[in-house]
Amino acid sequence: MKKFKKKPYIFLSSILLSQSALSVDINSSIGSAGSDGESGKTNMSTSTGQAGTTGQRGSNGGRGQGTTVDTYGHPGGDPSSGQQGYADGTGGNGGNGGNGGEGGGANTPFTGRPAGNGGRGGNGGNGGDSTASALGGPGGNGGNGGDGGLGGWSTVAASIAGRGGDGGNGGKGGNGANGSDGTSGKDGAKGGNGFDLTPEMEGDSFIIQGSVSGGMGGYGGAGANGLNGTKGGAGGNGGRGGESRNYAENSGGNGGNGGNGGNGGNGGNGGNGGNGGVGGDGIIVSKNNVQITNLSTVVGGNGGSGGVAGSAGLAGAGGKGGNGGDVPIGSPTTRGKRGEDGAFGENGINGRVGNGGAGGTAINISADGVILLNQGKVLGGTPGSINAQPGEAIVVSGKNSHIINDIGGEIWSSGLNSKAVEYEAGADNGIFEMRTNSIVDGVVDATKISNSKLVLGGNTAKENSTFIASKIGNGRQYQGFSNYEVNTSEGSTWNLIGETTALTPWTVTEGTLAIVSDHSLGSTDGALTLNGGVLQTVLNVNSDRRFNLTAESLNGGILTDGDLTLTNVISGVGGLKKTGNATLILGGQNDYTGRTIISSGNLFLTGEGGIEHSESVELSKGTSLNISSTTGGTMVNNLTGDEGSHVVLGDRFLTVNSLADSVFSGEFGAEGE
């Protein structure tokens, strides 16, 4: 466990200069807020484009020449459609159709022959479409159809007068323009950092006594509104049917059909709101090999809110259909049909509200060899919206870091999908240590790094703390650690409760690790290493995992308040010290080489179990070594025992290899003797 050296400190709370220390005041340091994003621009040009040119009126039909009895007047000429309106303008109206030509006279001496019929009126021109890209006008109106020509005349009273010409059809109204889409708002800027601990700063120890906060991210710009679609042009009216004339009665012409109205333009889509800016970091550490003690509160900046969405433009109305053409009074002919109204355009789609900015990181460690002792509160920034990423409390990208959440220390994520501590790829050899009465709210993620370690620590005597093993593993609170250690002060205990199937190779270096079940130690593929610390069994425990003894001193060992049965091998250069009144049962062919000390309780060897590689076996008063259940007896080295100790043989043989000065003052006997 790393200890702080006595070096000059930098107190981040008040200005103080001396020969041995440098202090800097960053009390209540808050990073500057990020700039707000610009709102989207609405294309609101009010200039109107030139209207489309109105189509010219159709030529009147020529008068019929009385050269034959069945000559008809020529139809009126159809005009050209109105020209398309320019951008931002109004579509041109269609030209009116020309009137039908007058019917030719029946220039004949024969009675009963018909005079010529009047010519058909010309069709009205179609209205021009409006194709405005921003503030367009409606489509042009269709031209009216030309009237039908008069029926022809006859020089003979008994002849039949010519029929009036049909009226021309009205032109179709031009389509309205689609409204322009609103532009999206700009994203807000990232908030400023609260404090940067840079390589240029003097000192290698820093104490944070004043609160530090990252700046808030800028607000996203508002999206612009979409423009409304424009109205379609009205259809042209149908031409009036021509009248018959001369001495005899005959029918007039049919009325022309009204033109259909133009379709309305679609509304423009609203612009999306800009995204909010990311909150600034509270503290950025880019100076290698520094020690930081946090006594206050460090908070990441809040994310900026997303911009407001632009509203959709409304659909343009369709143009009205043109009226049908009239017929002469008293004529049995048909009035023209009214044109159909144009269809409404479609409404635009509302824009999307901008996403809020992610919350800022409270402490961002990019340097190597950083030790962070947290006795205050570390909290990630709040996101700018529900769907935005909350800020992490601590992010580590530098190697060889050691984060200690000390007594009273708190590390808080700021919401779902946020992490209390995130080790980024490459931040290898990271250590995360928690101590009694500390709080970690959120995931501690070491899945991206190698040789990571989770430590249950402490530096106060006779602490009694609890850790829940089921919090370890994929999808759990503590993820991706490759090593696990108990390294607290002597006399203090960490109680490991609950179960996990994760691979958790525990090492007990100092202090006591207490269990009620072997399942608390994780998969049996992970060995338990006693490196000077104590494993305590509170209840009876059976285990098939390997044990390693690495400490040459015998301050640690196994404390059996409940019987402990080990069926696998105990290895290593260290010794085994057994305390507690319950029994330690060994069934493996153990090959550890250190001393075996039975200070209290019983050591029971069974099956092929043996301790023949152990340097010595030492029994205290009231303890026993029992080999009665071994397969064929066993061997021990340098057996010693106090008066009142026992070796229980049963019907097995015990071979003792002892030095001349080894003294056994206890008793040998069969089981029960």
Describe every region a protein language model picked out.
Residues 382-385, 389, 394, 413-421, ...:
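Surface-exposed loop/turn positions within long extracellular repeat scaffolds
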Residues 482-487:
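Outer-membrane translocation/initiation segment of Type V secreted surface proteins
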